[in-house]
């Protein structure tokens, strides 16, 4: 259940984080199958939605920021064209109102108006990610899914982008699902954490409790991070002989 909060989904590569996000967005392609009795998004069972129902929901009530703008943005269309296209899919606006909405969206993510005339290949990684966020927020969604939005950025830009997402989610009273490998960022910017292993949730906790996690899988994820104190030392690794899906009493 996702309330009006910032929920993080963490786990090693292949644990099912991005696939969970794709299921929520209706983007699991055949032969993939989503198996559940119900899968509710904003009170609607999305497993029963028609293609028309998905078009109304996706990009409007629920939106997604992907990992890399180089692959998510259209390389042969200007930023303004892509933003206006996202608006016309969900709103009927005059040309003037559409232009104003696009300018407001760009300003909200800290970019200057000349960016609108540029193409994705002319943008830096940080600028491209801000454009992706502007696209996702354009129709004021109630839920934002951010799938590794900082993975291609350096440490300084990672913090800037996460702070922008937190600021926008608070201003818009918008729920956010953040998928990330960066546990310190999650601990600093999120409210709650779900930990996934082999396609299953094995742990749940307040984000601030990550450094003191007791579940063996979560604890290893936290301690295997390199830092200044572990320079030159062998980092802990996961004990693959242990069944992490068998959670201890009190863990979920």
Predicted regions and their residues:
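A short, surface-exposed alpha-helical micro-motif characterized by mixed small hydrophobic
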Residues: 186-188
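Conserved ABC ATPase "signature" region
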Residues: 45, 97-114, 222-223
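A short, proline-enriched helix->beta-strand linker immediately N-terminal to the Walker B motif
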Residues: 138-142
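Conserved ABC ATPase signature
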Residues: 119-123, 127
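ABC ATPase NBD coupling module
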Residues: 33, 46-63, 81, 89, ...
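Short catalytic/signature loops enriched in Gly
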Residues: 6, 116, 204-252
């Amino acid at each position: 259940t996702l309330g009006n909060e910032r929920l993080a989904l963490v786990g090693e590569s292949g644990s099912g984080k991005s696939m969970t996000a794709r299921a929520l967005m209706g983007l699991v392609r055949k032969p993939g199958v989503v198996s559940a009795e119900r899968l509710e998004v904003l009170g609607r069972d999305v497993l029963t939605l028609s293609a028309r129902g998905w078009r109304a929901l996706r990009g409007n009530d629920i939106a997604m920021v992907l990992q890399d703008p180089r692959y998510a943005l259209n390389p042969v269309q200007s930023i303004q064209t892509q933003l206006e296209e996202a608006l016309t899919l969900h709103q009927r606006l005059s040309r003037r109102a559409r232009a104003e909405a696009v300018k407001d969206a760009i300003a909200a993510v800290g970019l200057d108006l000349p960016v609108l005339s540029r193409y994705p290949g002319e943008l830096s990684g940080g600028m491209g990610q801000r454009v992706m966020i502007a696209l996702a927020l354009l129709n004021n969604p109630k839920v934002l899914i951010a799938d590794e939005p900082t993975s291609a950025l350096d440490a300084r830009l990672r913090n800037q982008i996460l702070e922008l997402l937190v600021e926008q989610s608070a201003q818009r009273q918008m729920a956010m699902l953040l998928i990330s490998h960066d546990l310190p960022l999650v601990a600093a910017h999120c409210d709650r954490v779900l930990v996934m292993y082999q396609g299953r949730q094995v742990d749940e906790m307040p984000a601030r409790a990550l450094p003191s996690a007791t579940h063996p899988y979560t604890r290893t994820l936290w301690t295997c991070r390199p830092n200044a104190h572990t320079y030159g030392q062998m980092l802990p690794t996961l004990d693959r002989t242990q069944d992490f899906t068998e959670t201890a009493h009190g863990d979920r």
